[in-house]
Amino acid sequence: MQDDIKSKKKLLLATIENIDQEGRGVAHIDGKAIFVEGALQGELVECESYVKKPSYEIAFTDRVIRQSNLRVKPKCDHFSRCGGCSMQHFEFHAQIAAKQRVFENTLSRIGKVKAETILTPLAGPSWHYRYKGRLRVKFVVKKNKALVGFN
């Protein structure tokens, strides 16, 4: 029975080009954007879509085939289940750089603004777990249940 379930999975092979504002890897397959949770820029992953729209899909990483050198072991034991800290697997300084790129791209693409000067990003300690206690609730279609966690 378990083998039947695995054989019915439609896995996509995706090369992650960038990171989006939600911390998901971005790939393009057949002209469609694929947003992959748990994937980092430069990685080659097998992923499974759980949201399918005409112009994009949202997927989760099933297996990392070629790992980024920026991937680190998440410090929270609940990282893979909670959903509250979407970038813990991403090296801290690379996170800052990715967030800066997202910010600049958003200003340019949506705001039609080009910054004359870009200041060095502000960053605190590299590990500020529970610095701000926030409750996050996420419905996971694949599991057909809600996940609740603090970050």
For each feature predicted by the language model, list its residue ranges.
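Non-catalytic accessory regions of SAM-dependent methyltransferases
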Residues: 1-151
